[in-house]
């Protein structure tokens, strides 16, 4: 019995020695894995007057021109605000002003997926939200009401910015 007890003790020591042989050795390496996400949204817009908008008589809903908008990066709508824009009866309009800043006529944006907004979120201004994730949009601007216009150059100021839920 003594022999077998010694054999068991030797086997136990071998097993313990094997267990101590497994483990970490050497130094520990440290890696900081930084990542940069370069998601950038850029917005630009251009204006082109409609060739048929010559006056002096203009009809209600006559096309004044087109806002061509490029909106890169992830977004689900584009907001368009107008300097001096207002909402009346649920319809947002923007003034086209003369050289002295006096309103001469009003324009509006309307169409599928376009909602009039009392506050677009752009500097608290009224305008429109175009529900679209497209990169390029061509948004028509039409007259609000009919009028007879004097000769001159009239300007509306639009602010365009992307929106993401």
Swiss-Prot record:
According to its record, what are the GO cellular component terms?
Answer: pilus
- This protein's name: Fimbrial protein
Q: Where in the cell is it found?
A: Fimbrium
- Primary place of residence? other
Functional summary from the UniProt entry: Structural subunit of the sef14 fimbriae.
NCBIfam families per the record? PRK15228.1
Q: Which Pfam families match?
A: SEF14_adhesin
Q: Does the keyword Signal apply?
A: yes
Phylogenetic lineage: Bacteria, Pseudomonadati, Pseudomonadota, Gammaproteobacteria, Enterobacterales
Position of the signal peptide: 1-21
Q: Which UniProt key words apply to this protein?
A: Fimbrium, Signal
């Amino acid at each position: 019995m003594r022999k077998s007890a010694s054999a068991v003790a030797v086997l136990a020591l071998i097993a313990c020695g094997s267990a101590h042989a497994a483990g970490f050795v050497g130094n520990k390496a440290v890696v900081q894995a930084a990542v940069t996400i370069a998601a950038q949204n850029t917005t630009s817009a251009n204006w082109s007057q409609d060739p048929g908008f010559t006056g002096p008589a203009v009809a209600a809903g006559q096309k004044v021109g087109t806002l061509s908008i490029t909106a890169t990066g992830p977004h689900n709508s584009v907001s368009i605000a107008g300097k001096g824009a207002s909402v009346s009866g649920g319809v947002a309009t923007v003034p086209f002003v003369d050289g002295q800043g006096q309103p001469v006529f009003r324009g509006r944006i309307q169409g599928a997926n376009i909602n009039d907004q009392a506050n677009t979120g752009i500097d608290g201004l009224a305008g429109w939200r175009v529900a679209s994730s497209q990169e390029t949009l061509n948004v028509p601007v039409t007259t609000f009401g009919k009028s007879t216009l004097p000769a001159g150059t009239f300007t509306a100021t639009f602010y365009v910015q992307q929106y993401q839920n």
